[in-house]
UniProtKB/Swiss-Prot annotation:
Keywords: ATP-binding, Ligase, Nucleotide-binding, Protein biosynthesis. GO terms for cellular component: glutamyl-tRNA(Gln) amidotransferase complex. InterPro entries: Amidase, Amidase_CS, Amidase_dom, AS_sf, GatA. Its EC number is 6.3.5.7. This is Glutamyl-tRNA(Gln) amidotransferase subunit A. Gene3D superfamilies: Amidase signature (AS) domain (3.90.1300.10). SUPFAM superfamilies: Amidase signature (AS) enzymes. Heterotrimer of A, B and C subunits. One of its GO terms (molecular function) is ATP binding. It catalyses: L-glutamyl-tRNA(Gln) + L-glutamine + ATP + H2O = L-glutaminyl-tRNA(Gln) + L-glutamate + ADP + phosphate + H(+).
Amino acid sequence: MHNLTIAEISRKLQAKEFSSEEITRYFLDRIKQQDPTYNCYVTVTEELAMAQAKAADARLAAGNAPTMCGVPFAHKDIFCTNGVKTTCGSKMLDNFVPPYNATVVENYINEGAVMLGKTNMDEFAMGSSNETSYFGPVKNPWDTNCVPGGSSGGSAAAVAARMAPGATATDTGGSIRQPAALCGITGIKPTYGRVSRWGMIAFASSLDQAGVMARSAEDAAIMLNVMAGYDNKDSTCIDEPVPDYIANLGDSLAGVTIGVPKEYFEVGLNPGTEARVQDAIKQYETAGAKIKSISLPHSHLAVPAYYVIAPAECSANLSRFDGVRYGHRCDDPKDLMDLYKRSRGEGFGEEVKRRILVGTYCLSAGYYDAYYGKSQQVRRLIKQDFVDAFKEVDVIMGPTAPSPAFAFGSKGDDPVAMYLEDIYTIATNLAGLPGMSVPCGLVDNKPVGLQLIGNFFAESKLLNLAHQFQLATDFHTLAPSSLA
C-alpha cells in the first residue's frame, strides 16, 4: 500500500476499496517501523490522525467528498498546528504549541485530509542539508550516509521512503526543489503570493513560499489545488483566480518553447547531473517541444544577493524570539539584557546565529545602502532577466542542484560551499517565479532533478510539462533499493 500515489489512494477511498482509517493506520505503522532509520518526523500525531480518518470516512460514506478527503499526508514543522507542537527544527521552539492553525493547515483540514505528523527540517528553514536541525539530521533513503537536502529534508525523505504519499514544504531559496531533487521526488514552489504564508513561521518574508512534495506531478497538482488561493490574513497573498491544476495535465507539448540558460551549464555542475538533465531536455524535444538557448546574464549574482537579503530579513523576523513571550527562556537571568542574550544564545543553533549576525551587519548604519540596498537593485536585474526570457520562451529548464546528494559533514566547515547548493534555485525566489523539480535519472544510484521555471502564475503549465515527462519516463516511480 505504501507505493500508492495520492491519486490512487483517493480513487480507492472513493470506490470503498479500503477506508481512511485502514490506510492511515498502515502509514502510522510504517512510520514506527521506518522512521528510526531516517528521522523524518519530529512529531507523529497518531491519535489526531485516526480521529481525522474516522471523520473522513463519514464524509466519504455520505458521498461527494473532496479529492484529498481521507488521504494521509505530512506537514513540514514550520506550519502552526493548533494544539500540536510546532518547532521549526529549533531548540528555541522545542515546546511551542500554537493556539491556531496556519491557513495552509486549515485548508487541508477543510478538505478532510489526514495529518500523519510534522516533518523534520533545517532550523528555521536555514540550510541545504537538514544538518542544522535541533532534532538531528534526516537521512537520505537512497543513501543513509548522505543528506536529503534542505531545508524541507524531512518532507522529502518521508515521501521518498514511502512514509507519506505527499507532504507540505516551504521554499525560500530552493528548500522544496533541492531536497526533491536529492530524494528523487517531485516538488513545486508556486509563485510568490499564490499560497498563504499566514501561520507559516517566517525566515525571509519576501522570499518564503509554501508548496508541496509528492511522488508525481499529478499528486502535486492535487495537493496544490487544496493549498492555493487568496487569504486576507496574508497581505502578500495575491487575489488571483486559482485554476484546476488537474484539469490541464493533458495538454500537448506541441508548440511549447523551452529555454535552456547557458549560465546553468557552466563551471561547478557535476558531469553526470548535466548528462541526465540534457537527456531529459532532449526527451521534451522528441515529444514536440522546441528548445532554445537563452541567457540569464545576472545569474552569477543571485547567490551573493540572496545571502544579503535573506539574512537581513531573518535578522528582523527572528528578533521576536527574545525569551519573553514564547520560545526558549534561559534559567535564572540576572536582568533583562541577560535574559535576551542567554535565551537567544541557547535557543538558536550555529547557522541561525551566523545568518542573524550577517543580516544585522548588513542592516546597520553605514552599511545598509552598500549591502541591502545594492542587493535589492541586483534582485531587480535578476527579475528583469526572467521577464526578458519569457518574451521568447514558455518555460525555462536546467538542473535543480549542482550534484546528487553529498555525504554528511562534507560541507559543514565551508558555509559558502553549502550556500552554492542553491545556485540554480535562488534566482527563482528572488524573482518570485514558480519553480519545480522532477526526477530525471540516477548518477551513482542517487537521484538527479530537472528544474522547470515558469512565468508568474504558470503553475498549471509546469505541472502539465512535468506530467507529460512522467507519462513518458519512469524516473518518478523509482524507489530506494533499501526500502522495505
